[in-house]
Regions:
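Histidine-/acidic-rich catalytic cores in large beta-rich domains
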Residues: 1-320
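Intrinsically disordered, low-complexity Pro/Gly/Ser/Thr-rich segments with frequent PxxP/GP/PP motifs
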Residues: 325-326
């Protein structure tokens, strides 16, 4: 994920340390110079207290709160949402089932639940919200898409996972002063085991569930999108597509901007399109003899713009091969 730290400001980027692990690093990049001005590797805050797997944390979202200089991150494989100070890297709180961190030095950061709860598992798009949904100025709200899925390898988590085969749109009210949390909204959706997103639209007071990886649908349609009234939880719209997708985002369309003529520059490098080669986990271990299947990556040219898409792969480089080895 790449977001603006503030409008037209620096960029916050989720990336990989490649120090034996992937999807475990956050960088702040100066928008003008491209220089990395701040960064965090997850091992630095959790001190190696994890099972040493390549993708032990799996960061999937980050947001920044300028008024407190804090970030909210979603390390999916820790079944947790974490808020920390971006300058000092000090943990503010952790939102998860308290049993996950029980008996560790991080137990003190876990928010204490009030009322009924369905805790998240393998969540995506965990963000601090701008809208006050509970009418309490002493709390902040956090929304997320709860995939509600646990991989078999996580034997300890499986002991308290409820086994429900449905996902949820969740909203929590967090009292940061008292270190408590209430679950103020839980809307079930079709079971989407990975990817996916939740979006609240303040203008309409609607909440959207973007289920990007539906495995057990009767009609074999893999992507499902829901639109609910936030207050009544009434289903307003529902759309499905044949293929999986990573996540969906709301689009605010500026029709005047779209109607303006597109500037066409004369410095495009034109060439032919070739099917990419398959790489292993790390980009320096390429095996050119392995070719990705057509369903795993797509290339198409629209005018002078090349679009590249990949399923479950990260594209780190595109190489154009022209005549006479150019």
């Amino acid at each position: 994920e790449v977001i603006e730290k503030e409008p037209d400001g620096n960029l916050l980027v989720l990336t990989s340390s490649l120090e034996g692990h992937i999807e475990d690093k956050i960088q702040e990049i100066d928008r003008q110079t491209g220089e990395v001005v701040n960064e965090l590797i997850m091992e630095d805050i959790f001190g190696g207290k994890y099972e040493d797997r390549v993708d032990w944390t799996h960061l999937n979202t980050v947001s920044y709160q300028p008024e407190t200089d804090t970030i909210v991150i979603s390390p999916r494989n820790l079944e947790s949402v974490v808020k920390l100070n971006w300058t000092t890297k000090e943990i503010q709180w952790i939102l998860c089932d308290p049993r996950f961190w029980e008996g560790t030095e991080y137990e003190k950061y876990v928010l204490q639940p009030e009322g009924d709860f369905v805790y998240q598992f393998q969540q995506h798009t965990a963000y601090q919200m701008e809208t006050d949904l509970d009418g309490d100025d002493q709390t902040i709200e956090v929304s997320m898409f709860d995939n509600h899925y646990v991989k078999v390898r996580k034997s300890d988590v499986l002991k308290y996972f409820d086994g429900e085969k449905e996902s949820y749109l969740l909203v929590y009210a967090v009292n940061e002063a008292e270190k408590t949390v209430k679950q103020i909204k839980k809307i079930p959706t079709v079971w989407s085991t990975i990817t996916s997103s939740a979006i609240y639209d303040a203008d309409s007071n609607h909440i959207f569930g973007m289920c990007g990886h539906v495995k057990d649908s009767e009609d074999k349609r893999r992507g499902m999108t829901y639109e609910f009234d936030y207050d009544t939880e009434e289903l307003i719209n529902q759309f499905s597509i044949k293929s999986y997708y990573y996540r969906a985002s709301e689009m605010k369309i500026d029709w005047n901007d779209l109607a303006a003529a597109m500037e066409i520059k004369d410095n495009y490098i034109m060439g032919e399109l070739y099917q990419p080669v398959k790489a292993t986990w790390f980009f320096w271990q390429k095996k050119p003899e392995q070719v990705l299947e057509d369903g795993e990556i797509t290339l198409h040219l629209t005018g002078q713009v090349l679009y590249a898409g990949a399923y479950d792969h990260q594209i780190s480089q595109i190489i154009f091969h022209g005549k006479k080895n150019t």
